[in-house]
């Protein structure tokens, strides 16, 4: 079984690429979704978040206060790293469990999709890495429409991620998301065949 880490900045199209890889037969572990689940459901993670960022990190109904946490995390240097230090070890444990299940079930390609793959050390948990990059103006337009946030908020999040140039340097494969959806589908298929050898 091959493990592939897929990353890219906010709005780059990495989740779309992973969807195309799933169509080819890959299994995808969505690290960002797992992190959100852990922040909501894992008692140790919740307690550490409250200790680090205050009780306002959760609403009275016990749901995560995403707006408050985003303001806390993206508003001051070092706080993103603090949150990641709480959540990422648990995400990696979940990925290792997913890897064992996938191997037992005969999966040929397991994809680890993560916005902060390199920053969190996730590249050490996979065989091959791929980065999805896209023009900044397109990324900002997509995210503001998708998440109902301002362009300034998107840029603030971008500052906490590797630049596209750094991603190009560090990744084994780079997918340029600068064309149509069909272009991205074709590039995703090419990536699939390159990393699996057609298996």
From Swiss-Prot:
Q: Where in the cell is it found?
A: Cytoplasm
GO terms of molecular function: ATP binding; dephospho-CoA kinase activity
Metabolic or biological pathway, per its Swiss-Prot or TrEMBL entry: Cofactor biosynthesis; coenzyme A biosynthesis; CoA from (R)-pantothenate: step 5/5
Q: Which GO terms describe its biological process?
A: coenzyme A biosynthetic process
Which residues are the signal sequence here?
Answer: none
Q: Which amino acids does the record list as binding ATP?
A: 11-16
Q: Which UniProt keywords apply?
A: ATP-binding, Coenzyme A biosynthesis, Cytoplasm, Kinase, Nucleotide-binding, Transferase
Please state every residue range assigned to the domain named DPCK: 3-199
Q: What is its EC number?
A: 2.7.1.24
- The kind of enzyme this is, by top-level EC class, is transferase
Query: Which reactions are catalysed by this chain?
Result: 3'-dephospho-CoA + ATP = ADP + CoA + H(+)
Pfam families assigned to the protein according to its UniProt record, in alphabetical order: CoaE
Would you name any one GO CC term? cytoplasm
Question: Which NCBIfam families does its entry note?
Answer: dephospho-CoA kinase
Explain the purpose of this protein.
Catalyzes the phosphorylation of the 3'-hydroxyl group of dephosphocoenzyme A to form coenzyme A.
Family per similarity comment: Belongs to the CoaE family.
- What is this protein called in UniProt? Dephospho-CoA kinase
Organism in which the protein naturally occurs: Salinibacter ruber (strain DSM 13855 / M31)
* Recorded name of the encoding gene: coaE
